Design a protein with these regions (language model features):
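A conserved beta-strand element that flanks and buttresses the S-adenosyl-L-methionine
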Residues: 119
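A short glycine-rich, Lys/Arg-flanked "PGG" loop and its adjoining helix->strand segment in the class I
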Residues: 131-143
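A C-terminal cap/extension of S-adenosyl-L-methionine-dependent methyltransferases
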Residues: 162-170, 188, 199-264
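Acceptor-substrate binding/catalytic loop of class I
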Residues: 168-185
Length: 264
């Protein structure tokens, strides 16, 4: 396998799935929180869903269980990750047409229709190139469509410390450099792509190596200090829309969601 990102994630399906199983660790809390916040930000969307780096499919599955999406295209560059997502979604989702595509997101082209919601979670650290990625995602949006984008933020001191201490080791282990972004980087990339930030959610205390030192204590701190993390957290999840939609009410119902409600 020539792509280093695909090769790295081929080893991780079981580890990745385990992060979404509730346990007393900071990592479990982090992934459960990411799932919850993504579902909140997607609350006004319905119709056609694209997850452009689905991993093992837990967040995709949670969104599809809402019953608001008639079709989902599930993309991942790793065959093992995509197979795991296929097994999960095929077993648990019965009212949505599912399509599974192994592809690099930059090379992915939809077969025809555009999307009402695009998920981009856990991706940009591994691929960077926001100046190319965001316009590509925007080009696949239906009218009223939105993007949910997640990143770890270098505005957070703990993130900067982890970057300084692990960058060389991560490069040797993965075979590629992790990309890091600040809030300003995200805002500038969105502006360049003609996207506006409709809403933002912050989470994660981001205590460096917290789970290595004491997972239970890290979990307790994450649980008890969620309010602080919602303002200053290490992770940012953004709801994006083309600039013409940016000034809409944050929870405005998308055209696809309006059509869905009309049929109920």
């Amino acid at each position: 396998m020539n792509d280093p990102v695909a090769a790295y994630f081929e080893k991780l399906p079981q580890i990745h799935k385990a992060q979404f199983v509730q346990s007393t660790s900071g990592a479990s809390f982090y992934f459960q929180k990411r799932l919850k916040l993504a579902c909140e930000l997607a609350g006004a969307s319905a119709g056609r869903l694209l997850d452009c780096a689905a991993g093992t499919g837990e967040i995709t599955c949670a969104l599809l269980k809402s019953g608001r999406f008639s079709h989902a295209t599930v993309v991942d560059i790793s065959p093992a990750m995509l197979q795991s997502a296929n097994e999960l979604l095929s077993a648990q989702i019965t009212n949505t047409a599912l399509e599974f595509v192994r592809s690099d997101v930059f090379n992915f082209k939809p077969s025809g229709s555009s999307f009402d919601l695009i998920l981009c979670l856990g991706l940009i650290a591994h691929v960077g190139r926001l100046d190319i990625l965001l316009p590509h995602l925007k080009s696949m949006l239906a009218p009223g469509g939105r993007i949910i984008l997640q990143t770890t933020l270098t505005d957070h001191a703990g993130v900067r410390l982890v970057r300084a201490l692990t960058a060389r080791r991560e490069l040797a282990q993965r075979g590629y450099r992790i990309s890091w972004f600040s809030q300003r980087d995200i805002a500038d990339a969105c502006n360049g792509a003609g996207l506006g930030i409709v809403e933002t959610r912050r989470h994660s205390l981001g205590i460096p190596f917290g789970d290595r030192l004491w997972p239970w204590a890290n979990f307790q701190l994450e649980t008890r200090l969620q309010k602080w993390a919602s303002r200053h957290g290490a992770d940012g999840i953004y709801l994006l829309a083309p600039n013409c939609q940016e000034r809409e009410t944050p929870n405005a119902v998308t055209p696809a969601a309006q059509r869905l409600r009309a049929t109920m």
